[in-house]
Amino acid sequence: GEIGLMDLAMAFAEATKDESMCITGRPLGWPSNANVIEHPHDFLGHTGGGGLGAGPSIAVGAALALREIKSERKTVAILGDGDYMMGLTAIWNAATLKLPMLFLIANNHSYYNDENHQIKVAEKRDRPVERAPIGQRMEDPAPDLAALARAQGLEGEGPITDLADLPAAL
């Protein structure tokens, strides 16, 4: 099965409740109350407009800044799979610079922000909405996101499809 975004958020919050971390972004639809935010470095904010590919670079930049100020915080990038796929060069930088980071990928098998936009444009222009996913869905074949992490020199786990397996992976 699939793990829903709310379940993922709650499991992540529980698994990391005692961690000192800097969340650099969260995917569209992530519940805003899922994480305790008390310090300016707890959460850097959203990337604005769901811009694909920005998340990994923002996370690496944050990790470098935290290293510079000698912070003990771990950088956590909660990304959609589209953002992750478009930002693999930044993922490689995280590995080569040995940055203490966690990339948590919420995989909906889509460049969803763009797919959703395509649906709205199709509706507005009276075009078939069933064509909107063309070039937006990441299926057949679905990329092996964990293998891509390993190919960059990082550890990679997944896909995790059972909520019971999630805490150990985090």
What feature does the model see in each segment?
Residues 30, 51-52, 84-85, 109-113:
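Short gly/pro/ser/thr-enriched loop/turn and capping motifs at secondary-structure boundaries
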Residues 96-170:
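Thiamine diphosphate
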